[in-house]
A protein has these predicted regions:
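N-terminal leader/targeting and assembly helices and adjacent pre-domain segments
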Residues: 1-198, 281-320
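Acidic, glycine-rich two-metal-ion catalytic cores of nucleic acid-processing enzymes
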Residues: 195-295
């Protein structure tokens, strides 16, 4: 009986650690990414506004340029980190469950245990995807993950660039038609610059939170799909006053990995989603796992069709 309780407690601890560690690293990545992307965008917007002032004074108007290349590079770097984190931490979690079944603790280069130093864990992940190893990381992370990231980030950066530049262009045009004198037009443009900045910052914050979740989840799914010990997932939401009904209604529900509805229930389910999928293994469910019937009644997600199909392709393409 004591041995059984020890095994159960080790499994619970591994699950708690997986959620807490993921949340902490997400927060770290999110803060760093938003800070750097805002800094890049602020400098970019200043150059756009200088260009706009010149155009207003000269009476000409040209389309503003796209986001700088280093914006895309920084976004790629963080999402690569998040993808690797999802893949590796999921891999470690399954190994910890395997050891817990034997009543033992997992001792690897990266663990999720409470006594493991947070900074050391993050440093290990960062070293794994450092620039010196960037070309070889696909030898550990499956090529499917690398290909997804290479294809996805340019599209994401393009969407953000188009969204922001279209709004900037609109403000510039409005400023050029405001007032009857050059001084009035310049004043209108400068007053609009703060609005543009706040709008851009809010967009960056939303994208950073959502896409870090997405990259992490894709890494987890690829890790799960390539591990025969994983038979399903548990949907875990961060339950607080910001949790949406979309996520709270799914919290604690289970779904088989081969359930065709999994892509529609894979985080992020909406903008700024903080939910994650926890692997369910044969060690937790030796008699098998059934999808929770409550999934028949949960509210629809706000995913883009494109993202649902990307998850579906990953699940279909990976070996079982």
């Amino acid at each position: 009986m004591a041995a059984r309780e020890t095994k159960r407690e080790l499994r619970k601890q591994a699950r708690r650690n997986a959620i807490v560690r993921t949340s902490r690293i997400w927060t770290k990545l999110y803060k760093e990414l938003t800070s750097e992307l805002k800094d890049i965008s602020h400098k970019w917007l200043k150059s756009l506004l200088r260009q706009a002032e010149h155009e207003i004074s000269s009476g000409t108007l040209t389309t503003v340029k796209e986001l700088p290349e280093r914006f895309t590079r920084r976004l790629t770097q963080t999402l690569r980190h998040s993808l690797a984190q999802g893949y590796l931490l999921n891999h470690v979690y399954v190994h910890e469950l395997k050891k817990a079944r034997e009543g033992k603790k997992y001792h690897g280069r990266i663990t999720l245990s409470d006594e493991d130093d947070e900074a050391r864990l993050i440093a290990s992940l960062e070293k794994f995807i450092s620039s010196e190893e960037a070309e070889e990381w696909h030898e550990v992370i499956p090529e499917e993950a690398v290909n997804w990231l290479k294809d996805y980030v340019p599209k994401l950066a393009g969407v953000l660039s188009e969204d922001v530049t279209s709004k900037v262009n609109s403000v510039i045009r409005e400023s050029m038609m405001t007032g009857t004198t050059l001084q009035e037009r310049m004043k209108a443009l400068r007053e609009s610059s703060e609005v543009i900045q706040r709008m851009t910052d809010a967009r960056i914050e939303a994208i950073a939170r959502t896409e870090i979740t997405r990259a992490d989840t894709m890494g987890r799914l690829i890790s799960m799909k390539s591990n025969e010990d994983v038979i399903g997932v548990e949907f875990s939401a961060i339950m607080d006053d910001r949790t949406t009904e979309i996520c709270s209604s799914r919290h604690g529900l289970f779904m088989r990995l081969d359930d065709p509805r999994l892509p529609e229930n894979t985080p992020p389910l909406h903008c700024r989603c903080r939910s994650l999928l926890i692997p369910c293994t044969v060690y937790d469910f030796p008699d098998g796992l059934l999808t929770s019937h409550e999934f028949d009644e949960v509210p629809a997600s706000k995913q883009r069709d494109y993202d649902i199909e990307e998850v579906r392709k990953i699940l279909e393409d990976m070996p079982t």
